[in-house]
């Protein structure tokens, strides 16, 4: 049994995960007068408190998009009594499906129902459709009795091997193709291409067109047809074989050089850009970085070079000169920033030539990663946002540097009562790594406004290779943001803190305006793909996209001394790209820490690839994934607001998942370093707010909630794998709006919601909690036994002695072996008591020193114990034997008497055994969310029994532990 069986069961479950719900259509036969005014869809929403508003004063919104039509839009719904309504008008009757989400407020993640849903329009030409939606319900009703029905092309694709053939389908039977007047037209020239025949299949819904001229692979074409006498000249774009992944394109246009962008020297600057479809390219030199400023110095023609690149060298010292590229692409004149720009002017519209060496702070040449371990398990990571860290006056940071990179360079900061804040606080906390939310150039904060109070997390990338300007003291000077970013990194390094950068290559802010797509249309983005939930997905499988991502991250690692990366929505990436990143980054620094969000998402891939999801973790060695099992086990399932977890309700149903956390072994992981264990991150509610929201039936006092917070932290900090927490979790960080309501996702909420409130340290309970976290971190760092690097070691050295089944209080206790992973201890014993009762737990034979008890934790002995110990309600206790009196742990194989039937680890011999691994790219139709998510492993297994009998077996288990 063990890990192999769990993996096989998980694969079976994921392979049959159910699809996204669709609506029930109420069909009536009515005569509707045709007109050509488009399609109206009336959305009616009921069953929610329609008077409610979020912190931005926004109530329920409808977010809707035409499938295949690019980005969608959000609309405020009009409330009338108990119904909120929005009437959507579609000018383009060629729309086949209209997607919609009802959400509370203006945040992506505040969906009323988890899944994206769709209204089918495959035979609708006009009139009105009514969609009735009930809050929190999957089913919705569609009334199309007032719709005009008719012929509609629903798909069209050129033959991959013969570009004179096109296959197209229609939504209703077509027996007379002549009446439809079917033609093929070039979208570039407007010229029609002759059709020699149109042959139907047996259904009269699928047809093969034969053309008298072959289509061009890099062209754009559409079918033109008449739906009826009233609806003539309708169009549908023909899908061509993906020219960008063809051997012809990739062999001719895959550039492998390392000199893209502007390469500066005092004597000259060489500009090189990849634009394989362009017929001419110029580099435009400007005096300023302000878009629209009439200050062109000169426009220099570029010469076509190898593998789709264009190059120009301009003599003279151009340091500080701003520039763009203009190009003729398929007859269109375009201008854009350099995709490889190293820095830019205000709002990232013009790149800037820069002497990077001139931006280095003093001592930069000797700066290096203070994290010297190649084992990711040795990291302790805290996540924070640059602005949140210091924007409050209580941060003690100088006014000029509040919310800026330079806040991290100020030592000795304190709040008004003398409590340590800022950089010194991080140092005191003892974390090894600070994970910074996006600090590349993002789109949604206007840098032209000094000290702009506009706020965003930054998951809306605009330029990937330069720092965000709003965090610098002068966004108008491209050199300042580079220098100040480096000062921040060096200061953190000088204080023994490594820097992890949060990167978002899986989607861009605006696909049509993103520089790569401007120069090579649609190259960076997958076709008609929105798995990210942000309007576009990045085509990581294309050669030059993969190169761009690897080049970019290696550049940050080398130029800015970044020590690790967290990849947003890495489940959209192909595993080859992730493995290329791991290889390239580990070559820069073997101690690099790498992890991401491995949620399974629905995305349209242009090649036969595997995605870097949790279930494919074994295919991406050296790369970790957020362990949502831990999160949901400790505080309750993210998407079930009424559910309590192990730490905040002694939920016995969560015990198995807590033990899988302790052993660093979620069902999908292949190595302990792949399990990023956490209670909270920037997404969703803070841990403290979640605990206050989720309480057992008998309720918790504030003191008990504080204990639950500490217990959840203790489990993460003493478990195998990699501990991670949101900065402020240790001081009960809350995010509430002006009305006192919890903010679920504060992506664009004001500073009043997002900032770290350093004055809370004035409260003794808050300061004590901070000390508790610091003590846990110090204890973890002092004991390698908490940081074992293989499942073989864990299997040999960790024994679950009390597995939560001994009584109704779900107590768990485990023992770590003497000298495990090079530890100096003769044994470690850890006990978790989530109940409201004091529990007496029998200790293994030996003399034990207590290091964690009640609200105290650290590396100082708090007391001694022998035989047994009382464990306080809702608390953790950690004891260490240091005199050789404890017996060594026997391997935990599920046969340890009555104490345990849980296997904590699996042999590393399975690491290369395909049969032991989960299915690839599982759950493709799982509901998608930006930021945080949950791996769906709950499924129905339907077993059909032949011989006149059938049975349905339902297997429902969160993780197969």
Residue spans for each PLM region:
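C-terminal membrane-anchoring or membrane-association module
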Residues: 943-961
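Substrate-binding/active-site clefts of carbohydrate-active enzymes
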Residues: 387-560, 570, 574-589, 593, ...
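Loop/helix patches that line or flank the sugar-binding groove of alpha-linked glycan CAZymes
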Residues: 672-845
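C-terminal beta-strand-rich structural cap/linker in extracellular carbohydrate-active enzymes
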Residues: 275, 319-321, 862-891
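The feature marks proteins involved in alpha-glucan
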Residues: 35-54, 81-160, 210-270, 292, ...
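Sec-dependent signal peptide cleavage junction
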Residues: 18-36, 927-936, 954
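Active-site-proximal helices and loops of the catalytic beta/alpha 8
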Residues: 39, 100, 104, 292-294, ...
């Amino acid at each position: 049994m063990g890990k192999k069986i769990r993996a096989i069961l998980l694969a079976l479950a994921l392979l049959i995960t159910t699809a996204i719900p669709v609506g029930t259509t109420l069909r009536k036969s009515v005569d509707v007068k045709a007109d050509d005014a488009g399609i109206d869809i009336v959305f009616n929403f009921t069953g929610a408190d329609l008077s409610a508003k979020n912190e931005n004063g926004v109530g329920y919104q409808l977010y809707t998009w035409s499938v295949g039509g690019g980005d969608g839009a959000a609309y405020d719904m009009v409330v009338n009594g108990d119904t909120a309504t929005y009437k959507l008008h579609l000018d383009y009757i060629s729309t086949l499906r209209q997607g919609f989400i009802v959400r509370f407020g203006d945040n992506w993640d505040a969906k009323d129902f988890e899944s994206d849903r769709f209204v089918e329009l495959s035979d609708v030409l006009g009139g009105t459709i009514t969609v009735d939606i009930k809050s929190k319900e999957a089913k919705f009703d569609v009334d199309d009795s007032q719709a005009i029905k008719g012929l509609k092309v629903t798909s069209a694709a050129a033959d991959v091997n013969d570009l004179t053939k096109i296959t197209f389908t229609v939504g209703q039977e077509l027996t007379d193709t002549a009446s439809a007047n079917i033609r093929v037209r070039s979208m570039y020239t407007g010229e029609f291409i002759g059709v020699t025949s149109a042959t139907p299949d047996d259904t009269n819904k699928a047809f093969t067109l034969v053309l008298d001229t072959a289509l061009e692979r890099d062209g754009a074409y559409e079918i033109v047809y008449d739906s009826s006498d009233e609806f003539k000249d309708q169009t549908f774009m023909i899908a061509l074989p993906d020219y960008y992944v063809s051997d012809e394109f990739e062999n001719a246009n895959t550039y492998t050089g390392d000199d893209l962008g502007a390469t500066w020297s005092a004597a000259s600057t060489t500009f090189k850009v990849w634009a394989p479809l362009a017929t001419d390219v110029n580099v435009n030199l400007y005096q300023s970085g302000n878009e629209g400023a009439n200050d062109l110095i000169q426009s220099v023609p570029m010469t076509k070079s190898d593998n789709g690149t264009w190059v120009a060298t301009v003599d003279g010292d151009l340091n500080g000169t701003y520039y763009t590229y203009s190009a003729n692409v398929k007859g269109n004149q375009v201008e854009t920033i350099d995709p490889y720009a190293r820095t830019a002017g205000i709002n990232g519209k013009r790149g800037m030539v820069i002497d990077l060496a001139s931006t280095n702070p003093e001592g930069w040449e000797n700066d290096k990663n203070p994290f010297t371990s190649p084992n990711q398990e040795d990291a302790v990571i805290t996540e924070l946002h640059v602005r949140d860290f210091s924007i409050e006056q209580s941060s003690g940071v100088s006014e000029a540097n509040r919310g800026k990179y330079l806040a991290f360079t100020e030592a000795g900061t304190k709040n008004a009562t003398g409590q340590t804040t800022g950089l010194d606080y991080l140092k005191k906390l003892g974390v090894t790594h600070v994970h910074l939310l996006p600090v590349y150039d993002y789109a949604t904060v206007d840098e032209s406004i000094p000290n702009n109070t506009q706020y965003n997390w930054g998951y809306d990338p605009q330029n990937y290779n330069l720092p965000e300007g709003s965090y610098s003291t002068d966004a108008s000077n491209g050199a300042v943001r580079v220098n100040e970013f480096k000062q921040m990194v060096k200061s953190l390094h000088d204080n023994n803190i490594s820097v992890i950068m949060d990167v978002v290559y899986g989607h861009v802010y605006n696909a049509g305006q993103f520089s790569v797509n401007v120069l090579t249309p649609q190259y960076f983005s997958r076709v008609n793909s929105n798995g990210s939930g942000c309007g576009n997905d990045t085509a990581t499988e294309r050669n030059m996209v993969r190169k761009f991502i690897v080049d970019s991250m290696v550049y940050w690692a080398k130029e800015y001394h970044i020590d690790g990366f967290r990849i947003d929505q890495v489940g959209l990436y192909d595993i080859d790209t992730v493995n290329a990143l791991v290889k390239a980054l580990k070559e820069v620094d073997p101690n690099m820490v790498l992890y991401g969000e491995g949620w399974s998402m629905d995305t349209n891939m242009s090649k036969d690839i595997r995605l870097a999801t949790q279930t494919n973790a074994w295919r991406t060695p050296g790369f970790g994934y957020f362990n949502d099992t831990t999160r949901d086990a400790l505080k309750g399932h993210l998407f079930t607001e009424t559910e309590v977890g192990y730490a905040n309700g002694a939920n016995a149903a969560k015990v198995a998942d807590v033990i899988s956390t302790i052993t660093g072994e979620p069902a999908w992981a292949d190595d302990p370093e792949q399990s990023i264990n956490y209670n909270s991150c920037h997404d969703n509610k803070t841990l403290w707010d979640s605990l206050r929201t989720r309480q057992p039936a008998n309720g918790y006092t504030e003191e008990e909630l504080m204990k639950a917070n500490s217990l959840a932290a203790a489990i993460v900090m003493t478990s195998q794998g990699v501990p991670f927490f949101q900065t402020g979790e240790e001081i009960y960080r809350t995010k509430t709006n002006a009305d006192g309501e919890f903010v679920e996702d504060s992506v664009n909420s004001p500073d009043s919601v997002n900032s770290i409130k350093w004055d809370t340290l004035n409260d003794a309970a808050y300061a004590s909690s901070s000390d508790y976290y610091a003590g846990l971190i110090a204890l973890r760092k002092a004991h390698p036994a908490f940081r074992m690097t293989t499942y073989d070691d864990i299997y040999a050295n960790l024994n679950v002695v009390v597995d939560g089944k001994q009584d109704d209080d779900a107590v768990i206790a485990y023992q770590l072996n003497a000298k495990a992973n090079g530890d100096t201890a003769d044994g470690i014993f850890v006990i978790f008591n989530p109940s409201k009762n004091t529990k007496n737990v029998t200790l293994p034979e030996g003399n034990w020193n207590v290091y964690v008890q009640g609200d105290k934790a650290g590396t100082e002995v708090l007391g001694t114990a022998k035989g047994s110990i009382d464990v306080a309600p809702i608390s953790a206790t950690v004891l260490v034997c240091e005199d050789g009196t404890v017996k060594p742990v026997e391997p935990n194989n599920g046969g340890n008497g009555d104490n345990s039937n849980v296997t904590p680890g699996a042999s590393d011999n399975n690491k290369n055994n395909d049969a032991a691994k989960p299915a690839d790219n599982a759950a493709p139709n799982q509901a998608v969310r930006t930021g945080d998510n949950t791996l769906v492993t709950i499924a129905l297994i339907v077993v059909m029994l032949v011989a006149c009998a059938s049975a349905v077996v339902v297997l429902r288990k969160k993780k197969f532990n």
